[in-house]
Amino acid sequence: MYKRQMMEKLSEICAMPIQLAVLGSGEASIEEKMAQLEAGNKGKIAFYKGYNDSLAHRIYGACDLFLMPSLFEPCGISQLISMRYGTLPLVRETGGLKDTVTPYNEFEKTGNGFSFANYNSDEMLQVMYNAIDVYYNRKEDWKILVRNAMNTDVSWAKSAETYCQLYGQLHS
């Protein structure tokens, strides 16, 4: 259902003031739809079927926003790579995505990306529109988010410290 909804929303996404780069493979019907959208939206959509690590890193570095609307994601590394490059992740709050992406708070000027809770295309689009609004109309907030994303500590040292604190609490 969600995949079908997303495919139906692609024309709305194409109407947004953005360019879209899609890298990956999946169901044949989705790949075909992406190829059709690319053909009909030259300069607006680029689709690369398959995976190319070098291209992936160029995409991370060139983008402003990295969309990762996963149904299930036990950890996820793509959002971490995107943050290191200064590309803000827009994720569905699941698994490791929820653990690593702190959503933008416009009042406190905090966060390192954008997120949505429910697995539906309308909620995702609403958050996309918000992210685009921040990008175009609240440039200082965007810069803060990029800085926060690039400074997000996802090192093993931080994880080890968290585990040591947890074990210390259990031992007490």
Language-model features, listed with the residues they occupy:
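Catalytic binding pocket for nucleotide-activated donors in carbohydrate/polymer assembly enzymes
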Residues: 58-151
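Active-site-adjacent structural elements in folded domains
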Residues: 6, 50-53, 130-131
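Nucleotide-activated donor-binding/catalytic signature segment of Leloir-type glycosyltransferases, i.e.
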Residues: 14-58
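Conserved small/polar residues in nucleotide/adenosyl-binding loops
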Residues: 1-5
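C-terminal alpha-helical cap of glycosyltransferases
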Residues: 156-172
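Short acidic-capped amphipathic helix/loop micro-motif used as an active-site/signal-coupling element
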Residues: 7-11
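Short alpha-helical
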Residues: 28-29, 54, 96, 122, ...
